[in-house]
UniProtKB/Swiss-Prot annotation:
The active site is at 125 (nucleophile). GO terms for cellular component: box H/ACA snoRNP complex; box H/ACA telomerase RNP complex; Cajal body; fibrillar center; nucleolus; telomerase holoenzyme complex. Ubiquitously expressed, with elevated levels in Purkinje cells, the olfactory bulb, and Leydig cells of the testis. It is found in: Nucleus, Nucleolus; Nucleus, Cajal body. Residues 1-24, 447-509 are annotated as: Disordered. This is H/ACA ribonucleoprotein complex subunit DKC1. Pfam families: DKCLD, PUA, TruB_C_2, TruB_N. Residues 446-509 are annotated as: Nuclear and nucleolar localization. The modification Phosphothreonine is found at residues 458, 485. It catalyses: uridine in 5S rRNA = pseudouridine in 5S rRNA. The modification N-acetylalanine is found at residue 2.
Length: 509
């Protein structure tokens, strides 16, 4: 037999496709096309949520209290809401034009979008341009927090006389940092009182010595008057100065680089939707309100607890799924659903360490509810007692308010505690006071025994002391009562007679 020849063919190596980095537009399309949802699991799965949108970004880095909950087919991802709800729960990062006032601009947008309510993140003077956050309908609940957020400006100051180079101007800007006294300008909508405003950082960008113009950048507290700052700059330099031009670069979380749009963009987007039913441009112009809350610490609640919070219930620990690191007491946080919707703004009552070690208690108190009521179904009042109460109301054993009637069984009256009643907690208080009364009775018995033992040893001493005390108390009571007995009356009459005698003697003299 001839030796068999083995022929080997070279293996074809599959070429790995080079993954191109996603552009911003592609990411937006993916976020809109795909489904983003936290699924209930018994084990914690490893997720890559760095590309998840808005409040669900880096969701896997949150601390897990429990991963088990019952998902409800209610609510939706903020980016996938219906266009009507999307606009009513959104905001616009508007590039305010020069000349119209902030209120005029907001009124125009309300008319263009045909909504009932709009608000803005802080008034800009008519000549000032730049970032103006316009909140629509439900998003107006975040207006106050946006108005108090920090702001950044780029301005031009005109000096009345020339100075030697721009170093003096930059030094003067550095001195005008920190807490400063400011009085509003002559033409202002508020009372011209002295107020303290903080300037966090400022730097000079450019100075033109020929035209005596300086461009500067300022990061400051809300309510700072840049016009007043320019006047102070001129006073520091000794030449005088005034503000020539101003633009707001950042308001809160949003800056001029974060999808800023003009009034024409809003008008065109609404026209396209009205005439061609193309909502893609409206979704580019309007952004969900959750984008304003991305800098806050997050608490994730179960779906069954969402509607209770919308009705004002306390944020309790059993309804918590996940929580973020670094939560401090009295810090402003945002409470979200598993789909990334903002439920409310809250004030934390527990730190992250306390949340991780406790199994009950109030985590936070509500500051402002954002979500509409009954977006999720009611899940309270489904316990055994509540269900029994509903059945008894249907059967006529209780009235329509759940109060006992003549037909109510005696066992129900004895066992059931009505916490909503005005005379509530009677049984509870008795149950709480019972051990206290028992303890007091034991203490009284012990005291009696101690006193009896003391009386057996020295019976005469305590009796003498008691008698002395009684004797001492009698004259005190008489004096305090203001002369109830006859002796007191005699003393007063004697004093009156003496006074009369003295008066008669003086008259005779």
């Amino acid at each position: 037999m001839a030796d068999a020849e083995v022929i080997t063919f070279p293996k074809k190596h599959k070429k790995k496709k080079d993954r191109k980095p996603l552009q911003e537009d592609d990411v937006a399309e993916i976020q809109h096309a795909e489904e983003f949802l936290i699924k209930p699991e018994s084990k914690v799965a490893q997720l890559d949520t760095s590309q998840w949108p808005l409040l669900l970004k880096n969701f896997d880095k949150l601390n897990v209290r429990t991963a088990h909950y019952t998902p409800l087919p209610c609510g939706s991802n903020p980016l996938k809401r219906e266009i009507g709800d999307y606009i009513r729960t959104g905001f616009i990062n508007l590039d305010k034009p020069s000349n119209p006032s902030s209120h005029e601009v907001v009124a125009w947008i309300r008319r263009i979008l045909r909504v009932e309510k709009t608000g803005h993140s802080g008034t800009l003077d008519p000549k000032v341009t730049g970032c103006l956050i316009v909140c629509i309908e439900r998003a107006t609940r975040l207006v106050k927090s946006q108005q108090s957020a920090g702001k950044e400006y780029v301005g031009i100051v005109r000096l009345h006389n020339a100075i030697e180079g721009g170093t003096q101007l930059s030094r003067a800007l550095e001195t005008l940092t920190g807490a400063l006294f400011q009085r509003p300008p002559l033409i202002a909508a508020v009372k011209r009182q002295l107020r303290v405003r903080t300037i966090y950082e400022s730097k000079m960008i450019e100075y033109d010595p020929e035209r005596r113009l300086g461009i500067f950048w300022v990061s400051c507290e809300a309510g700072t008057y840049i016009r007043t700052l320019c006047v102070h700059l001129g006073l520091l330099l000794g030449v005088g100065g005034q503000m020539q031009e101003l633009r707001r670069v950042r308001s809160g979380v949003m800056s001029e680089k974060d999808h800023m749009v003009t009034m024409h963009d809003v008008l065109d987007a609404q026209w396209l939707y009205d005439n061609h039913k193309d909502e893609s441009y409206l979704r580019r112009v309007v952004y969900p309100l959750e984008k304003l809350l991305t800098s806050h610490k997050r608490l994730v609640m179960k779906d069954s607890a969402v509607n209770a919070i919308c009705y004002g219930a306390k944020i309790m620990l059993p309804g918590l799924l996940r929580y973020e690191d670094g939560i401090e007491v009295n810090q402003e946080i945002v409470v979200i659903t598993t789909k990334g919707e903002a439920i409310c703004m809250a004030i934390a009552l527990m730190t992250t360490a306390v949340i991780s070690t406790c199994d009950h208690g109030i985590v936070a108190k509500i500051k402002r509810v954002i979500m509409e009521r009954d977006t999720y179904p009611r899940k309270w009042g489904l316990g055994p007692k509540a269900s029994q109460k509903k059945m008894m109301i249907k059967q006529g054993l209780l009235d329509k308010h759940g109060k006992p009637t003549d037909n109510t069984p005696a066992t129900w009256k004895q066992d059931y505690i009505d916490y909503s009643d005005s005379g509530k907690n009677t049984l509870v208080t008795e149950a709480v006071q019972a051990p206290q009364l028992a303890a007091e009775a034991v203490n009284v018995i012990k005291r009696k025994r101690d006193s009896e033992s003391e009386s057996d040893e020295t019976p005469t001493v305590p009796q003498l002391k008691e008698k002395k005390k009684k004797k001492d108390k009698k004259p005190k009571t008489v004096l305090e009562s203001g002369g109830e007995t006859g002796d007191g009356d005699n003393d007063t009459t004697k004093k009156k007679k003496k006074k009369k005698v003295k008066v008669v003697e003086e008259m005779s003299e």
